[in-house]
Curated annotation (Swiss-Prot):
Any Pfam family: PEPcase
Reactions mediated catalytically: oxaloacetate + phosphate = phosphoenolpyruvate + hydrogencarbonate
HAMAP family referenced in this protein's UniProt entry, alphabetically: PEPcase_type1 (MF_00595)
The protein's required cofactors: Mg(2+)
Assigned EC number: 4.1.1.31
GO CC annotations on file: cytosol
Name this polypeptide is given: Phosphoenolpyruvate carboxylase
Active site residues per record: 199, 672
Single GO molecular function: phosphoenolpyruvate carboxylase activity
Gene Ontology biological process terms in this record: carbon fixation; oxaloacetate metabolic process; tricarboxylic acid cycle
Family assignment from sequence similarity: Belongs to the PEPCase type 1 family.
Record key words, sorted: Carbon dioxide fixation, Lyase, Magnesium
Top-level taxonomy: Bacteria, Bacillati, Cyanobacteriota, Cyanophyceae, Nostocales
Amino acid sequence: MGSVLYSLSESANLYPASELFLRHRLQIVEELWESVLRQECGQNMVDLLRQLRDLCSPEGQATKDQAVSAVKLIEQLNINEAIRAARAFALYFQLINIIEQEYEQRQQLTRYSDLEAETAPLNGSENITSSSNHNEDDVIFNRGLGTDFLGKNWTNRGQGKQKGTFAALFPLLSKLNVPPQQIQRLISQLDVRLVFTAHPTEIVRHTIRDKQRQVVDLLQQLDEVENRAKDGGGYPWEAGEIREKLLEEIRLWWRTDELHQFKPTVLDEVDYALHYFQEVLFDGIPQLYKRFKYALNQTFSWLEPPSKDFCSFGSWVGSDRDGNPSVTPEITWQTACYQRKMVLERYIKSVTQLIELLSISMHWSDVLPDLLESLELDQSQLSEVYDALALRYRQEPYRLKLAYVLKRLENTRDRNLALYKGETPTNEDSPMYRSGSEFLAELRLIQHNLTETGLSCRELDNLICQVEIFDFNLTKLDIRQESTRHSDALNEILDYLQLLPQPYNDLSEEQRVAWLTTELQTRRPLISSELPFSDKTNDVIKTFRVVRSLQQEFGINICQTYIISMCRQVSDVLEVLLLAKEARLFDPAIAVGTIQVVPLFETVEDLQRSRSVMRQLFELPLYRALLAGGYKNTEVKVPNTELTPQSPAPSPQSVLTPDLQEVMLGYSDSNKDSGFLSSNWEIHKAQKSLQQIAEEYGVNLRIFHGRGGSVGRGGGPAHEAILAQPGHSINGRIKITEQGEVLASKYSLLDLALYNLETITTAVIQASLLRTGFDDIEPWNEIMEELAARSRQHYRGLIYEQPDFIDFFHQVTPIEEISQLQISSRPARRPSGKKDLSSLRAIPWVFSWTQTRFLLPSWYGVGTALQEFFNEEPEEHLKLMRYFYVKWPFFKMVISKVEMTLAKVDMQMAGHYVQELSDPEDKPRFEKVFEQIANEYYLTRDLVLKITDHGRLLDGDPVLQRSVQLRNGTIVPLGFIQVSLLKRLRQSKNNTATSGVIHSRYSKGELLRGALLTINGIAAGMRNTG
C-alpha cells in the first residue's frame, strides 16, 4: 500500500532491535488493514485510500494544491464510499494505537529487568535541594538537545521512563545523600490517590474495546511464537495461523458499529470505569507494592515500606452530579452496591482457588489452637456448611475454614444484591461479613497459622493485600456539586421556614457567614423528614442523606469527600457543612464530622481568591476544630448556646485525617477562561500560596489536581507535571483525576498500568524530597507574572472581545455535531439555555478545536507574550528563556506541552475548515479571525523553537515526533472527508445542489452518521477528545 510508514521504511539496518520490532509490527498491521479493506470493500477502496494519503506529506501539512486534489477525489464519492473511507482511516488509527501500546508494554518489561544492573539519575534531578549537603555540580545535567537520533534507543521517552521507576529513584536518593529519616517520614505518609471520572467518557464503544483486546492478545501470542521460532522451537505454521486469526478478528471489528447506538446511562459509565479494575488494577496494585518494597530494600534495607494502600483509587462515576441531572441519590447508592458486587465476586473467586490450593492435612502438618477454635465457632453459626463438608474436609482444616469464609462471602454478596435492587435483604440473620476488616481478620488467621507452621502461600498474601487496598468498596466515591445548588436550596428552605427577614440569596457574604456560623453551633434541625420543597432542593437534601446511608451501610470510607465546584467564597463551604449537619454528618456541639468539604477553585479569579477564602476558613474556630477532629483536640472553647442540648445524642466518630485540608484546583475552566499560560501560572501560584497558608495555621494540605486528558485541560505526561509542581505543596500527598478518555491508554495493559502508577509515585517522592528552589526566585516569578498577564490579555482579546469569534467557533468547528455524539450521560452545556462560551463546558470546547486541528486552547497567547518580552531586550531575554527552559521544571513543562501541541496543529487543514464551512456572507469576517489565529501560531512556533534550540518541533523527543507524523499524514484526508460531510449536512435543509461536497441522494441522518464517524476517527488519530 502507499507508504504508510514513510521514513520508517528507510535504512532499517541502522535501527536498534527495539525499533525493528516496532517496524515489523507496523508492517503486519499495514498488511492486515489492507487485506481487510480489500475483502470488505474491494480493491477500488484500497486504491482510493492510497491516492488520498499519497496527496499528503508525512508531516501532515496539506498544501493548497494537495487540498484541491483531495477534495476533487472526495467530491466523487457517494455517502457509502465516504463512510467507508472514514471508517477505514479510523480503524487504521486504532490499530496504530494498539501497536504503540503493545510496544511500550514490551519496552517496560525489558527496561524494568535491566534496571537492577544499571540505574541513572532522574530527569529534573539537577540543582535540587534537600536538607542533606551535596554539590550542585555532582549532578550531571544533560539537555539532550541536537543529539543524533540514530545513536539512541528508538524512544528518547523510553530513557525518561526508565528513570521513573522505584529501582532508579532510591539509588538516586542515596547518591544525593538524602537523609534516610526524611525518606522514612515521607514514605510513612505517602498518599497517592487517582480518581476515575466519566467526563469525557471514552469515545470508543465498550464492544470495540473488547475487539481491541482480542487483537492485543493475538499480537502477544504472535510475539511468543516468533520468539520461539528464533530459538529454533515451535512450528512454522503457528505464526501464519495467528495472522489468520488476526485477520478474522479485524474483519469482525470492521462489521461492528463504532458509534454508540444510545446515550449511555450513568450505570453504563460505572461499568465501563470498573472494567479496568476487573481486568488490570485489582491484580496489578499488589504488584506495585511489591515493586516498591523490593526496590526500597535494595538501597535502604533498614527502612519500612509504606502501607499497602499508599496508592489508592477514587471515583466520580456515579457520584459526580455537577451539571449531570442523571446522577441521582439512587444512582449513587446503586454505584456503591455495584462496586461492592464486583469486589466480592473477585474475593469469592480467590477463596475458591485457595480451597483447591490449601490441601494441607493434619496428618502431616500442625494446626494452631486459634484456628481450631474458630472452626468450632463457624460450626455453630454455619451448620449447613459443616454438615455438607465436614466429612470431606475432616483432616483438612484450611479447606474447611475457607469453606466457611466462602459461605459468609456469598451471604454478603446476596445481601448486597438485594440492596442494589432496592429490596429489603431476606438473609439479615445469616452469618456474613459486615466489613472488609472482618474478612481480613479471617484471612490473617489462616496466614498466621501457615507462617507458624513453616508455610507460606503467595495467593493468600496477594488476597490479603487486595483486601487491605480495596476493602469491600473497591474505590471511594467523591460527591461533587456546583456551589449555587446549595445556596439556592438553603434559600428555599429558609424562605419556607421564614427564619430570615429577607431571602438568603439577597444577603451579603458577611451576613451569610455570620448566620451560617451561628447556625453551625447548634444541633437544632432545620429540615424535617418530609421534604415540601422543589425537586432540585429535595435532590440536594437527599444527596446528603444518601451519603449518611452509605456510610452506615458501607463504612465511612466509602464516601467522605464532598467537592464544591465553582467555589468562590467562605459561605460556599459553610453551606455544605450546614447541609451535612442536617444529615447528621457533622455534629456542631463537638465539631466532629465524617465528611470532608473540599473547595474546588476553577476560574482565574477564584484561583487568585483561594488564599483569602482558606485563610478566612482557618480563622473560624468551628472549622479549625472540625479539621482537628473535634473541640477536644483544640484549644478552642466549646460553644455553649441555649440551643445546644446538655446531653447530646450519639455523635459521629471522626475518621478524617487530623488537620488535613484537601483543596481542588481546576485546569479546564481556568484554561478556557484565560488561556494555557495564564491558567498554568495561576494554578502554580495558588499551590504555593495555599501551602503557605496551611503551614501558617498548622494544617496539612492535599492538592487535588483536576487534570483533563488533553493539554488544554491540564493533560500531558504526569511525571513531568508533578516534578514541575512547587515541592512544598506535595509533601508526599497528591490526588489527580484520571479522565475517562485516557483510561484505555493507561490501564488496558498490566505493565503500562504499573508503569503509569510507578512514575506518578516516584514523581511525588522526588518532588517532595528533591526541590529545585527555582519556584522561590522572586525575579523569575515576576517575569512569569508578566508573561502570564500578557498571554491572558491576548487570549481574551480573541475569545471574549473579538465580536466575530463566537460565530466563527460555531460555524468552523463541529461543536453542534459533537453534542450529538452518544458518548456521555452529561450534557455538553451547562443548563443556562444559552449558546455562548460561558455555558459551554470545557470538554466539548477543547474537543472541537482538536477536531479542526487548531488545538487553540493549548497555545494561543503564548507567542505574543514571549514576543513582547523579547522585544524589550532581544538577546538577553532569549538567553533567559533558554535558561528557564533548562533549569526551571515548571517553565520546561509549560514550553514542552506547548511544543507538543503545536506539532499536532495543522494550520493549512484548519484553514480548509474556515474556507469550506463559513457561510458566504461571513467568510470575509472569519478570514480575518483565522489570519489572527494563524499569525499567532507561526509566531508561537518560531519562538518555541528558539527557546528549545530545536530545528523542528519535538526534535527533543523523536518517538513522539514520529508518532505525530505517522498520524498527521492520515488525519488530513480524514479531515477533508469530515469537512465535506459537515458542509452538506449543514446545508441539507436546502434542496439545491451544493458544489464542493459529496454528491449523492442521502438523508440528513446518513450525513450525520458519516460526520460522527469522522469525529471518531480524528479523535483516535489525535489520541484524545476533550
